[in-house]
UniProtKB/Swiss-Prot annotation:
Cytokine secreted primarily by mast cells, T-cells, eosinophils, and basophils that plays a role in regulating antibody production, hematopoiesis and inflammation, and the development of effector T-cell responses. Induces the expression of class II MHC molecules on resting B-cells. Enhances both secretion and cell surface expression of IgE and IgG1. Also regulates the expression of the low affinity Fc receptor for IgE (CD23) on both lymphocytes and monocytes. Positively regulates IL31RA expression in macrophages. This is Interleukin-4. One of its GO terms (biological process) is neuroinflammatory response. The keyword Disulfide bond applies. Interacts with IL4R. Interacts with IL13RA1. Disulfide bonds join C27-C151, C48-C89, C70-C123.
């Protein structure tokens, strides 16, 4: 029994340290993947990037970081669900079609990663202001880069 009580404090310490290491490491990996995906998305010019989405960043003063990530994921999900088979986005050429499919795949990946960071089940999105998908992604990229710089320091 004496041995068990002596081992408990070091075991709790190791458990706490391992949890912090894993959390910080996950933060870096997830943010790196999000930023990489956003870089790819913002470099692409497709027929759909000029379409409008709800601008969740317009009035985000009283919004937590998790709510922002959740709302961004919701907006992306609404967009790719609605425009995945949109003939305006598919284009007339094989190259336009391929770019659109790649855009949708990247948006789905981004959605999944944002939901993981948010850790919320659902969040409301008010459709007051609009911006283009391109501008939305640029603003999200800026936010993610800021978060990454804080996370890695």
């Amino acid at each position: 029994m004496g041995l068990t009580s002596q081992l408990l404090p070091p075991l709790f310490f190791l458990l706490a340290c391992a949890g912090n290491f894993v959390h910080g490491h996950k933060c870096d990996i997830t943010l790196q993947e999000i930023i990489k995906t956003l870089n790819s998305l913002t470099e692409q010019k497709t027929l759909c990037t000029e379409l409008t989405v709800t601008d969740i960043f317009a009035a985000s003063k009283n919004t937590t970081e998790k709510e922002t990530f959740c709302r961004a994921a919701t907006v992306l999900r609404q967009f790719y669900s609605h425009h995945e088979k949109d003939t305006r986005c598919l284009g007339a050429t094989a190259q336009q079609f391929h770019r659109h499919k790649q855009l949708i795949r990247f948006l789905k990946r981004l959605d999944r990663n944002l939901w993981g960071l948010a850790g919320l089940n659902s969040c409301p999105v008010k459709e007051a202001n609009q911006s283009t998908l391109e501008n939305f992604l640029e603003r999200l990229k800026t936010i993610m880069r800021e978060k990454y710089s804080k996370c890695s320091s």
